[in-house]
Amino acid sequence: MERDENTRRLDFLREVWRLAKPYFVSEDRKAAWLLLAVVIGLNLFSVYLSVRFNFWRNDFYNTLQQYNVHGFWVQIGIFTLLAVIAIVTGVYQTYLQQMLQIRWRRWLTHRYLGHWLDDKTYYRLQLTSGTTDNPDQRISQDIDLFTSVTLSLTVGGAGFLNSVVTLFSFLTILWSLSGSLAVPLGSLGTFTIPGYLFWFALVYAIGGTWVTFKIGRPLVTLNFAQQRYEADFRFSLVRLRENTENVALYGGEPRERTIFTDRFGHVVDNFWAIMRRIKIINWWTYFYTQFAIIFPYLVTAPRYLTHAIELGGLMQTADAFGQVQTSLSFLINSYTDIAQWQAVVQRLGGFEQRMQALSQEARGKQPIDVERGGQGLSVSHLDLDRPDGVALLRDVNLKAGPGEAVLVTGPTGIGKSTLLRAISGIWPYGKGAIRLAIGKLLFLPQRPYLPLGTLRQALIYPRAETDLPETRLAEAMEKVGLAGFIPRLDEDDNWAQRLSLGEQQRLSFARVLLTEPDLLFLDEATSALDEANEAKLYRMLRGAAWHPTIVSIGHRSTLAALHDAQHDISVFRASSAPVTTP
């Protein structure tokens, strides 16, 4: 059992190093190592100042005991100088540590955002729901906690490095001041303990650490769960904000309140469990800390009362004992932070490993072979499955020649949208061959995506900038029936809520006019429009000068007249696939 525990600790430290190492070998490594070296240097200097304050206590209290007025003011002057230096050291140690933290967080955030967005990993993550919850929370919060807690626990003012250096710095002082303790053993004589205060501090701290570790272990699991519950609750609030109109039209406030209450209930219940566990830990740590104040005086008083040491020696010894005991009690004083750190490392490490695995899958040979070449579209012997392995479609064959318009129909839920996902290369479940013409591709979903920002940025999405003239943008808006919005192109707003679904679909057709794709895929992209405007937009595309190949998904019977061919893919339905009949 002990060996398994040690193995887990080593695995945890390896995981911390695996997460931390990339930054310190990155392009920002020079600044990272310089800041780290300065922070460590200030940390070591602060320990030196603690040693100087320890010797000052000896001189100061001896001066008081001797009623030396001149010596008193000299010691006050020395203290003032040491205090000023300590203040400057503490301020810059914290400031430079925070500078390192924000640079590290910035680099990690860019790195994780890159992993999340590259190879459409964000999409594959949501297909395998349950394996990695709330990736947004892991990027925004867990990275922040990882950098701040790692630096705090390792090189911070009360971190591991400070504790180790403080321990060895005061060991010699404590050993030399404590003398020997003679323990009578009756007829066996006397047993002498050299440097007995050091051994008392060691036993005191090790015993306290062992007890704290035993009663605090469940905090790791509880902190891990708390972060997940907090993220789930926050996500439900964001979902309401993004769908305010739909909820209002449904009158869904009671249901939303139930969802919020249930999710927040998990937050509260788990927090109560954390509170109860911390209460148990605090009973022990508060007792341990308070008794540590008087303990060195109890064990040092015999030497002072027998005039073996002066008052200054007593105070110096008590301070040295406190420094050794505090440094040895690092795990006790930091256990809550360590538990949170372990939870963050687990979440962040699992998230990174999952992203890397999905990225490797995406870059490997895909069972659905999507190639660019030839003309139009060709789908050959394509099988499509759901993420859980349930078969959707089998042996799909579909063709669309250059400039042709093909309509794909079928019952709801049969896999029409999944077919378009496979053609776009983002659906990994299945096998077969898809050949696409070389040229621009554009996919229009039923509900267009409108990014945050101005209406102009929504119009040219996914491009961040464009050199298209203003007249070209206005012409596209006018052709799709959005001329009234032309004066508002540079207005920054939440356009996904300001525009109706029909207006959003018109805007997506304006994107088509600006992009001029060779292959255009429409997934019920006109479902919110009336039949007359739907026909108008389709005729506009069919008559476009660049003659795009069009593949549409739709249910309206009027769409057939706007296409050259129609394919009902229900003939490819797998026997095990459940279908909802419209």
Set out the residue ranges of the language-model regions.
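Extended non-transmembrane interhelical loops and adjacent amphipathic helices
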Residues: 1-21, 102-147, 228-270, 342-355
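Membrane-integrated ABC transporters
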Residues: 1-50, 59-79, 93, 97, ...
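Transmembrane-helix motif of ABC transporter permease domains
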Residues: 28-50, 66-106, 127, 187-217, ...
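A hydrophobic transmembrane-helix motif
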Residues: 38-41, 45, 54, 159-187, ...
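Primarily ABC-family ATPase nucleotide-binding module
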Residues: 131, 346, 352-407, 430-437, ...
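Cytosolic ends of transmembrane helices, especially the final helix of ABC transmembrane type-1 domains
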Residues: 216, 220, 231, 246-252, ...
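ABC-family ATPase nucleotide-binding domain "signature/switch" substructure
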Residues: 422, 458, 491-582
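Conserved "ABC signature" C-loop
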Residues: 448-494
